[in-house]
Amino acid sequence: LIFPKNEYHFYKDRCIHKVCHMTNTDSFKAPDKYFAVLIENKENITVDGCGSTLVIHGDMCAFSLRGCKNVRLVNFTVRYASPTNFEMEVVERSLNKITYKIPSGNDFEVKNNKLTFFEKSPFSGENYYTYTANGECYCNVIHRGDEVFRTLRSPTKTALKIKKTGAHTVECRYFMSPKFKVGDVVAMSRNKLRDNCGLFFESCSDIFCERITVNYMHGFGWLSQMCENLSFDKLTFKPASGYRVSSFADLIHVCGCKGYVKITDSHFEH
């Protein structure tokens, strides 16, 4: 299976969905999983991306193998058009006011003094997902230079007034501004709900993955469950330009597998 080098777009409301269980996700609240690319019960095949980029629209799994044997996945990039970790960069700060910049891929609105992120289907006009800041988030993550750490501080929780000031900027006014620094990137997520994972292998054997770049994964990480003999070589987990987060949670996660799992010459940045 060859993807001639190009950018390929996959939309949730034009993709296949099936009921299945994924470990470390909420398969009771969200049993119906959506897949951009789903390959089932195939043997002795190669999927060559030829340097292509798979662009995912919606909160779904980018790529999945189920019940496959002796499969090679090579030379492609996975990128989400609107990542479901929501990043806010501090660009201006005063005693009672902070201006945040939001990446261009994430749409948002301010209504009733609440900041809500969303991604809208170009076909139906309905939202693939919505997330109201701190509505489903126990804690946030701060990226400060090379430091990454968790915090209970929030851009919106103590805000007295939230105002959209531009296509990609929002201003929050406070009684006392949270102790963020200019340049900090605060990342929030819907961490009460893991409804899917980014890439998914189930009941597969002898799978080889090489020269794959992952810019982001929704819901969880790259999950392999009940598999045998997995090889990952020259993988790169790195956020797309303008972002700091490369996965909702975890990067490679292996559960209930046997044989070997080999990870070689790879780069992990999260």
What spans do the regions from the language model cover?
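Generic short beta-strand segments
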Residues: 4-17, 103, 236
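Non-catalytic, alpha-helical, charged scaffold/linker segments
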Residues: 88-155
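Long amphipathic alpha-helical scaffold regions
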Residues: 227-262
